[in-house]
Design a protein with these regions (language model features):
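Generic beta-sheet signal
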Residues: 3, 95-103
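Short amphipathic alpha-helix with an adjacent loop that forms part of the alpha/beta core around
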Residues: 85-93
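Active-site-proximal alpha-helix that buttresses catalytic centers in soluble enzyme cores
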Residues: 2-84, 108, 121-128
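Domain-level recognition of soluble alpha/beta enzyme cores
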Residues: 119-144, 150-154
Length: 154
């Protein structure tokens, strides 16, 4: 399985609650940049899962639109998901060749670290960066890093 891991884009810091934070203008531009990058490079996952938090949904939306896809909201991508929990959800998709996850730090960084075999380590994932891991085995150390690129380099 090819796993495309996208951290939400830059979000405003002021909101009534953390879950209500929306993308800033910079974040909206970052999300559009990621969407165009995916289209230009033929990145077309079978499904796009996004955290229910507004900033993740707003990051996923331009990608889904550019690729002519829908977003599947995944509560298991809300803040606090463990690598094991995420991989358990992905295990049900064994016939899906490529999946995109749109979520949050530190969860995504912990998932990347887990798949790359880092013992209890989290990878620093920048906002609006896209990481591609080929998951050879859905377990610790079972992934191979293909690329990790921030929006500013796309």
């Amino acid at each position: 399985m090819h796993l495309y891991i996208l951290r939400h884009a830059n979000a405003d810091t002021e909101a009534a609650t953390d879950s209500a934070r929306e993308l800033s203008e910079k974040g909206r531009e970052q999300a559009r940049t990621v969407a165009k990058f995916c289209a230009r490079h033929g990145i077309r996952p079978g499904v796009i899962f996004a955290s229910p938090l507004i900033r993740a949904q707003q990051t996923a939306k331009p990608v889904a639109k550019e690729l002519g896809m829908e977003i599947t909201t995944a509560r298991w991508l809300a803040c606090g998901a463990t690598p094991e929990e995420i991989l358990a959800q992905l295990a049900a998709l064994k016939d899906t060749a490529a999946v995109m996850l749109v979520g949050h730090q530190p969860d995504l960084g912990e998932l990347i670290g887990h798949l790359l075999g880092a013992e209890g380590e989290s990878v620093n994932v920048r906002k609006a960066s896209l990481t591609h891991i080929e998951v050879l085995l859905p377990r610790k150390g079972g992934g191979r890093l293909e690329f990790a690129i921030p929006a500013r380099l796309m």
